[in-house]
Amino acid sequence: MTGRVCRGCGGTDIELDAARGDAVCTACGSVLEDNIIVSEVQFVESSGGGSSAVGQFVSLDGAGKTPTLGGGFHVNLGKESRAQTLQNGRRHIHHLGNQLQLNQHCLDTAFNFFKMAVSRHLTRGRKMAHVIAACLYLVCRTEGTPHMLLDLSDLLQVNVYVLGKTFLLLARELCINAPAIDPCLYIPRFAHLLEFGEKNHEVSMTALRLLQRMKRDWMHTGRRPSGLCGAALLVAARMHDFRRTVKEVISVVKVCESTLRKRLTEFEDTPTSQLTIDEFMKIDLEEECDPPSYTAGQRKLRMKQLEQVLSKKLEEVEGEISSYQDAIEIELENSRPKAKGGLASLAKDGSTEDTASSLCGEEDTEDEELEAAASHLNKDLYRELLGGAPGSSEAAGSPEWGGRPPALGSLLDPLPTAASLGISDSIRECISSQSSDPKDASGDGELDLSGIDDLEIDRYILNESEARVKAELWMRENAEYLREQREKEARIAKEKELGIYKEHKPKKSCKRREPIQASTAREAIEKMLEQKKISSKINYSVLRGLSSAGGGSPHREDAQPEHSASARKLSRRRTPASRSGADPVTSVGKRLRPLVSTQPAKKVATGEALLPSSPTLGAEPARPQAVLVESGPVSYHADEEADEEEPDEEDGEPCVSALQMMGSNDYGCDGDEDDGY
C-alpha cells in the first residue's frame, strides 16, 4: 500500500513489485508505472571486502568513461565530433591564455569566439592553433590588454602574417569591429624591459606624454603601435639622461631600425620637436599637424611642379643660347676673308657642303663649334699662302700674284710632325724623369712626409678624451663578445680545477708537396709509389722487376716444352676427315671437281702412329711427301707460317675422293656431325 492514487478508478490499493519495477492497481488492474528507475545512491561490496558506489558522475564538458552494461556488453556512447572539437579548443585556449597571463573572463570570451567560428565552419581548412590564437588576440583587442600578435607568434612559432590573416578573417566573418590599439598600453611593459630603475615611472610618464602628442599630430593612424612606443621611449630616455641605443630599443619593441628612425623623422617635422624639455613638459600646443602621409604627398606635388617650371625655364634658356649661337656663327662667316682662284673654289665647295649638311640636319652643336675653330685656324693659313709671309695681308692684292692660285707644291707641304711640334722632347723628358726616380714609382717602404703640415698630422692623433670615448664605443659594440670570452675563460678554469679539461692539440701545418718531376708516366708512377706506398704487404722491388721484364724475352719462349709447340701445330692443322651427311648422289652432282685430291703434308709428333691410307681410284703419281718428326725445338719457315692460316682456308667445303663420296671410308674416323643414321 502506498499513498498513490489510481488514475483510472481512483483507488489507493496499488501493488509495487520491485523485482519487475512496476506499479499495478489491484482494483482495476491498470499498470501505473513500468521500469521504475531508482535515483538513490547504491553501494556494492567488492570481492576484497571494500564497498564502492554504483554509477559515476559525468560533468557537462568533462570526458567521461564509456558506460558498460555487464561484462559482455560494451556500448559506445562517445561524444560527437563537434563536442570533441569544442573540448580540444577549450583546452588549447586555457593553455595559451595561462602563458599570456589572461584572466578567466578573457578565456571564456575567447572560447565563445571559438564556438562561433566552429558554428560558421571557419575552422575547416585551417589549423586549430591558428584559429585559437586569432580568438585570443581578438579578445586582447576588445578588452584592451597589453598583448601583441607577435607574442602569440612567438609562443606558437608561426609566421605573424599567417596569424594576422586568420584574425582578419574571423573579425570580418563574425562581424566584430576590433578597436585600434592604444600604444599607451605597451609603455609600462616596454619601460620595465628597458630597466630604467628608480626613474621607471618618470620615463614612462614622459613617454606617455610624447605618445599623446604624436596622436594629436596624426602619427598614430596607420602605424604599428610598437614603432611609436619605441620612438617615444628612446626620446624619453634621452630626456632623463639614460643612454639607450637604437639597437637596445628595437630588441625590446621588436621593430626594425628603419621603422624607428622613420618615426623619429616624422616627429622631428612637427613643431613640438622644436621645444625645449622644460617647454615641452609645461606647454601643450593647441595646433595640430597634418598627417605625415598628407605632408609627404604635398611635398611630392610641389617637387613635381618645380620640375615642370624648371623644365620650361630650361627650354627658354636653351632657345636663347641657340639664338646667340646662330648670331655668333653669322658673325664668324662675315669675318672670314674671301679666297681667290682655286682656294675660292675650294671654299665654295666647302660652303656648299656646309649648306647641304645644315639643310639635312646631320651636324650637331659640337660639329658647329669645331667648324668655327677651324675657320679661325684657316684664316691664318690663307693669309700665309696668299701673302707669302704671316701677317702680310696687303700682299694678297699685289699685282705680283695677278690672281694666280698658289702652286701645288706649296699646298702639298709635309704635315707637322712630333719633332717639329716639340712633342718628342717633352716625351723624352718625362721618360728620363721617371727613370731617374725609380723609388717614387716602386716605393721602398719609407713614408715621404715632405710637404705635409704638422697640424694636419696632429688631427689624426686622438687626445685623451677622444681616446676614452672611442674606447667606450668599442667596449659597447663588442660587449657581447667580451662577455662570451669571460664566460669561456671561467668555464675553462672550472674544468681545469675539476680535472676534466682537455687541451686542444695544435693543428699541424700542412706542407705543400713538391711536384713529381718525371719524363714518362711509368717513371712518375714509380716515384709516386716510393713517396706514398699503397700497401705494406707488397714487395715493391719484386714488383719493379716484374714490370721491367713484362715485355717478354727470347729465352722464356725457348724454355717452353717441346710437346706444347707440336700440339699447337697439330691442333691448327687437324681438320675433319670427312664431311658426309648428304646424299652421295647429290654430292656427286654438286661437285664437278677431280676425284683425286692431293692432301698437304702433315707433321706427326713423336710417339704418334701413322694410320695407313687406302689408295684412291685413278690416283696420279704424286711426289713423295716427307714426314717430319720433331725431336726438339723447331724453327718454322715462311712456308710453315703460311700453313698456319690453313684453318681459315679450310672453312669452306674440302675436296674428297671417290671412296669418300661413296661412303667406303675404311680407315677410322669420328662420326659425322650431320649423320642421319
Curated annotation (Swiss-Prot):
Modified residues (Phosphoserine): 450, 553
Zinc finger (TFIIB-type): 2-33
Keyword rRNA processing part of the UniProt annotation: no
Modification Phosphothreonine occurs at: 365
Compartments, record wording: Nucleus
GO cellular component: nucleoplasm; nucleus; transcription factor TFIIIB complex; transcription preinitiation complex
The keyword RNA-binding is assigned to this record: no
Region: Disordered, residue numbers: 340-368, 385-413, 501-521, 544-653
Superkingdom of the organism of origin: Eukaryota
GO-annotated molecular function: RNA polymerase III general transcription initiation factor activity; RNA polymerase III type 3 promoter sequence-specific DNA binding; TBP-class protein binding; zinc ion binding
Binding site for Zn(2+): 6, 9, 25, 28
Biological processes per GO annotation: DNA-templated transcription initiation; rRNA transcription; transcription by RNA polymerase III; transcription initiation at RNA polymerase III promoter; transcription preinitiation complex assembly; tRNA transcription
Keyword vocabulary terms for this entry: Activator, Disease variant, Dwarfism, Intellectual disability, Metal-binding, Nucleus, Phosphoprotein, Repeat, Transcription, Transcription regulation, Zinc, Zinc-finger
Subunit structure and binding partners: TFIIIB comprises at least the TATA-binding protein (TBP) and the B-related factor 1 (BRF1/TFIIIB90). Interacts with BDP1. Interacts with MAF1.
Disease listed for this protein: Cerebellofaciodental syndrome: An autosomal recessive disorder characterized by cerebellar hypoplasia, delayed development and intellectual disability, as well as facial dysmorphic features, short stature, microcephaly, and dental anomalies.
Protein name: Transcription factor IIIB 90 kDa subunit
Species, as recorded: Homo sapiens (Human)
Classification lineage: Eukaryota, Metazoa, Chordata, Craniata, Vertebrata
UniProt gene name: BRF1
